[in-house]
């Protein structure tokens, strides 16, 4: 069991290093792997509240706030007030965030190839 946990940890670490390097190579400096979880949620849903995002990525609202603040600062998303309820704020992708989807998918595809390259089709399922 210990060896399995060690292996999973090494795979996670190597995957994160790959993602960070690819983000940098594609001009997305400042982004980190944990930002990807939020982007995935927003690629699936056009607008979400902080609570919705927290539920989507299984993180606390304070953690989501820090991640969203950084993504907003980098220009990938913005906050919009609800037309129906001014107390409600939605998080939405900017054009930069929408355009980044192509790069995001490319990096994800490369990561999957790297992770599954030595596995048979049966093992990868």
What is each stretch, according to the model?
Residues 4, 34-35, 96, 123:
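N-terminal positioning helix adjacent to the helix-turn-helix/winged-helix DNA-binding module
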Residues 50-51, 62, 69, 89:
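Residues within helix-turn-helix
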Residues 1-29:
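N-terminal leader segment of winged-helix/HTH proteins
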């Amino acid at each position: 069991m210990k060896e399995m946990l060690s292996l999973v940890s090494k795979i996670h670490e190597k995957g994160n290093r790959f993602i960070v390097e690819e983000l940098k190579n594609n001009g997305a400096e400042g982004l980190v792997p944990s930002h990807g979880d939020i982007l995935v949620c927003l690629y699936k849903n056009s607008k979400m509240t902080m609570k919705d995002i927290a539920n989507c990525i299984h993180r606390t609202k304070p953690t989501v706030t820090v991640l969203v603040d950084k993504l907003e600062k980098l220009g990938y998303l913005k906050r919009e007030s609800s037309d129906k309820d001014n107390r409600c704020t939605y998080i939405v992708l900017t054009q930069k965030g929408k355009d980044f989807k192509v790069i995001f998918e490319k990096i994800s595809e490369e990561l999957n190839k790297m992770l599954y390259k030595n596995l048979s089709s049966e093992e990868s399922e």
